[in-house]
């Protein structure tokens, strides 16, 4: 009886994971529908993803943020990669360049999620031009 009245309540971590997954899905749709020209919704998908990461950057830089310093530093490094990849996509659009953004979003969502979605780590040797850090995929 009461089941229809029960509303799903998400924790902050679950909400953040859902937002990252949703953005990853939009980026994947752009990649999957890319023809000889970039999809019309690519700029919006990139803008949304960049906005999400800008908010994350601001939160990570907040002195009141309780996360361990090492974790904050690593997440900030990923945010710089997201910034660079987004700029690269704007300047020289190519569908395969979306993969890194999708992988990062899904990897972070996995870490936030209470229900894992299959995180695996890509060895740094397989991630050219982004330094020696391993990237979650």
Segments (PLM) and residue ranges:
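N-terminal intrinsically disordered, cationic/polar leader segments
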Residues: 1-62, 72-137
């Amino acid at each position: 009886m009461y089941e229809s009245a029960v509303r799903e309540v998400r924790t902050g971590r679950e909400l953040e994971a859902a937002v990252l997954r949703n953005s990853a899905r939009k980026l994947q749709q752009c990649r999957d529908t890319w023809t000889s020209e970039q999809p019309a919704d690519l700029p919006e998908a990139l803008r949304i993803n960049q906005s999400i990461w800008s908010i994350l950057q601001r939160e990570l830089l907040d002195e009141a943020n309780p996360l361990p310093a090492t974790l904050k530093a690593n997440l900030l490094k990923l945010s710089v990669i997201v910034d660079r990849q987004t700029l690269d996509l704007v300047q020289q659009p190519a569908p395969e360049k979306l993969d890194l953004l999708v992988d990062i979003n899904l990897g972070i969502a996995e870490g936030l999620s209470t229900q894992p979605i299959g995180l695996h780590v890509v060895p740094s040797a397989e991630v050219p031009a982004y330094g020696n850090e391993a990237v979650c995929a």
